[in-house]
Amino acid sequence: MDLDKPSVWGSLKQRTRPLLINLSKKKVKKNPSKPPDLRARHHLDRRLSLSVPDLLEAEALAPEGRPYSGPQSSYTSVPSSLSTAGIFPKSSSSSLKQSEEELDWSQEEASHLHVVETDSEEAYASPAERRRVSSNGIFDLQKTSLGGDAPEEPEKLCGSSDLNASMTSQHFEEQSVPGEASDGLSNLPSPFAYLLTIHLKEGRNLVVRDRCGTSDPYVKFKLNGKTLYKSKVIYKNLNPVWDEIVVLPIQSLDQKLRVKVYDRDLTTSDFMGSAFVILSDLELNRTTEHILKLEDPNSLEDDMGVIVLNLNLVVKQGDFKRHRWSNRKRLSASKSSLIRNLRLSESLKKNQLWNGIISITLLEGKNVSGGSMTEMFVQLKLGDQRYKSKTLCKSANPQWQEQFDFHYFSDRMGILDIEVWGKDNKKHEERLGTCKVDISALPLKQANCLELPLDSCLGALLMLVTLTPCAGVSVSDLCVCPLADLSERKQITQRYCLQNSLKDVKDVGILQVKVLKAADLLAADFSGKSDPFCLLELGNDRLQTHTVYKNLNPEWNKVFTFPIKDIHDVLEVTVFDEDGDKPPDFLGKVAIPLLSIRDGQPNCYVLKNKDLEQAFKGVIYLEMDLIYNPVKASIRTFTPREKRFVEDSRKLSKKILSRDVDRVKRITMAIWNTMQFLKSCFQWESTLRSTIAFAVFLITVWNFELYMIPLALLLIFVYNFIRPVKGKVSSIQDSQESTDIDDEEDEDDKESEKKGLIERIYMVQDIVSTVQNVLEEIASFGERIKNTFNWTVPFLSSLACLILAAATIILYFIPLRYIILIWGINKFTKKLRNPYSIDNNELLDFLSRVPSDVQKVQYAELKLCSSHSPLRKKRSAL
């Protein structure tokens, strides 16, 4: 008999063994009082055929402590762990006896059967079959490692006869696969499925998709339009090395494996090319290297680079026992999910953390030729950071006098692109000239005055560029929280104490944010789940968490540290749903002013909509610590506020315009009512009121001194402090909650319209947009003055009281003429002392830190209730 093939009867018994074992176990469990069946089992059940020796008998007959020296001694060595109690040699035959005090014999046999038969198969199988079994075992291990870690509860697996029996049946069935499987795929029967092992090695000469001259590539493998695997992101590299291995199950070879490469950005992903592999062309059990050329029919690049990977296709039985994998997956689901969700790659951290600040002061232009343009402005770009200067009327020497701060990354190309643009009467924009600055070539901590000639036109730009190192930003886990270390916290507190108030005035403080978790988020995917991540913004500083996949209650447990440049900044935390290569979906947002932070206390914030005016679905848990120097914060209050990066311009909205008109109307009505009150006093409509007003007027005018002006304003602060205004958030919140403000797009696609009519439409739109902005500024200015006296921001109100008290004392002891003289000398000599100083109004800079009524509504913390979700409210109403 051929030793390589089992007998038909043995094969049939081997296939039915798992079913019989399961049935016997169920009977024993149902009748525990019934004694177990101790009938002797046929000795061929442990052998493939009559010609194969009984391995258990061979070991039993061997002298104890000495290996068996028979003809098959090299194949009958069984580990000592297999010789457990309950299996003893009865005689020279192969019958076994089981003790009634031990476990059921069928369980012990099932637990040892897989090992014994595997040894037997390896002993007598042909070399080709041995390679096939070994290959299948390797891929089983790879698939197990991808599905999750090994379970940490061995009693759940070792005691399961179903699992071991199915493993034994699988190994035996794999022996019946023909040895000529590598000749081609046409000879394979239809019930087979396949496992495709992909070793993603590297990419070469990929295309540039970022402004800094590099890309952040990652790879997606798709089959039938579904994404089966997504690689990690390699940041700032056109020759990335992934070195990732993945095993994908394949049901049919009549399809193509799509390989797509994307460039990862903060909000979207750019396409970098694709390729495909025809699965039917692959050879079984053979690893082949494939160099795939990337192509994109919509791109103008001829060479988009290549992707290098190894592919290996193996065959698996179609009726594979699925519960084997489901058991392991169920046992290790929590552990594998925890490892995947808590993984934040070092490359992602490195990509977010900047190590320097580039301060650029745009002073003026010299002999700039504007041509037919009527207005001019400057755009500055460093990587994906972009600023736009204010627009000035056409001039040969335009004076901008603006300052911009960029983040500097030492591992990236530090090329600053500067463009001068012009506008004509028809609002057409045209680039007038460009110039570049290599930031890496500039010295540190030194103001560099540069006169940069423009490339494509006459003229030059004069600016100051200063590169300052920055070491206050970090991303870490909860276990390595910076402020959790008492010594480090003491050191940071000492750095921002009052004794160091005049050292590095721009370094105001430090903010630490613990992003713990979110709950009850909106389901953005069709599966009823979301892939949420958090974006934290403090001014122009942005950091983000990793993505937690398929979860509406994600736990990030990350710690973010921001350097504070302005204590009046607002921390904006936005939750997005990652959507692959598409822009992320909005899941909620919350705005937290720094001065309203309660140190060291975990807080639950109700998420709001994009306009921060209505409650959205879900909550987020944050814990924040704020350490700052009050003197530095006060000095920074009277300097120009930091400009924001260029964002999409706001479009004309009728609802926003109506809201701003109402805001201006309220301020105007307050002034009108005051004038009517004075008029009523003059007309003696009320005798008592007019008498009191007349007496106050006579006493004030007779004894008036200049110090009384700040003193009167100080008394208003005291009055409102003693009797605080009820309802910090005005009634505007009620009207805004019932109004959904959405930007409306006004498009005109009719090609038959005359140019004159189009120009008129543009002109009217510009005028209305300007009126809208002016009305908003006026309304905000009046509301900020009111909120300053209402103690809306105690820090600013206290600072104003301190300044007014000092002004009262100064005006009391120093004559007015000397004060005016000092002020005039300071104004006239300011340019002589500092030629590059930027003019500003300290009072307006102070008021810009006070929130308006709209901002008060946006920054207000909503109360957490059981039905905080508007969706639940609607459902309950139905």
UniProtKB/Swiss-Prot annotation:
The impact of changing residue 235 to C is: Found in a patient with left-sided obstructive cardiac lesions; uncertain significance; alters Ca(2+)-binding affinity
**CDD domains membership:** C2A_MCTP_PRT, C2B_MCTP_PRT, C2C_MCTP_PRT
Q: What is this protein called?
A: Multiple C2 and transmembrane domain-containing protein 2
The leader peptide range reads: none
Record domain C2: where: 177-292, 334-452, 494-607
Give membrane topology per the record. Answer: Multi-pass membrane protein
**In which residue ranges is the amino acid composition biased (Low complexity)?**
69-83
Task: Identify the residues that bind Ca(2+) 1.
Answer: 210, 216, 263, 265
Record note on what altering residue 475 to I does: Found in a patient with left-sided obstructive cardiac lesions; uncertain significance
Q: Which organism is it from?
A: Homo sapiens
What broad taxonomic lineage does this protein's source fall under?
Eukaryota, Metazoa, Chordata, Craniata, Vertebrata
Instruction: State one Pfam family annotation.
Output: C2
Q: Which of this chain's residues are annotated to bind Ca(2+) 3?
A: 525, 531, 577, 579
Named from the GO MF annotations, one term is:
calcium ion binding
Q: What is the effect of changing residue 695 to V?
A: Found in a patient with left-sided obstructive cardiac lesions; uncertain significance
Gene behind this chain? MCTP2
Where is the chain membrane-spanning? 697-717, 802-822
Annotated region described as Disordered, given as residue ranges: 20-46, 60-163
The record lists the effect of residue 60 to T as: Found in a patient with left-sided obstructive cardiac lesions; uncertain significance
